[in-house]
Amino acid sequence: KPLGFARDWLVISCYIGQRSVSLFRLGKENIDAKTNTIRLTQVKTKASVVIPILPQVKAILDKHNGGFPPLLSSKPKHNYNVYNDSIKEVCKLAKIDELCKGRIRNIGGAMSKVVTKPKYELVTSHVGRRSFASNFYGKLNQQMIMGVTGHRSESSFLKYINKDREIDAEALNSAFLNAM
């Protein structure tokens, strides 16, 4: 069951784009059934956010009697570590194992050199927020995505999702050529 709860939190995070510090504070009181939205104040930025409840999230909320899954640890500070370990296992079981480059933190928080590992070993709680931003980029208005994720500047947002103006210019040029 704990892996199932971790999976549910991971799916929710991919569709609501919040930092884990805000994600794990969500409760039934954040669900507005009348408007089918989740309302919250982000912990880091103090920004108020209203996020539509998409079908994938609704199915999980329904599975948990109209609320969010239980936390993975009774100690809030331990929840992040348990969640990170659990989503690695969830991704391993889901065979998300292609080799990819990534950075891992050394003890003390300093970044280490780039390593090549199976993707599931590099997954952290941050993957949901970044996936939300990357997956909806180009499909939703950029300002809408930034409003949900809490990014205040376009440059920080584009850096966050590994996009830049050159890539956008190439895509625009390609679209123009295909339209002619």
Predicted regions and their residues:
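Basic, Lys/Arg- and aromatic-enriched nucleic-acid-binding interface segment
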Residues: 1-20, 24, 81
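Short, basic (Lys/Arg/His-rich) helix/loop patches that form interaction surfaces
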Residues: 2-3, 88-147
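Hydrophobic (often cysteine-bearing) scaffold residues that line and stabilize catalytic clefts
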Residues: 5-6, 79, 83, 125, ...
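Catalytic core segments in nucleotide and nucleic-acid processing enzymes
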Residues: 16, 27-40, 53
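Short, polar N-cap/turn motifs at the start of nucleic acid-interacting alpha helices
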Residues: 29-37, 121-122, 134, 138-160
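Catalytic-site neighborhood detector that most strongly recognizes the C-terminal catalytic loop/helix
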Residues: 42-46, 142, 149-174
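C-terminal catalytic core of Y-nucleophile DNA break-rejoin enzymes
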Residues: 43-110, 122
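C-terminal secondary-structure termini that scaffold catalytic or DNA-interacting sites
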Residues: 96-98, 174-180
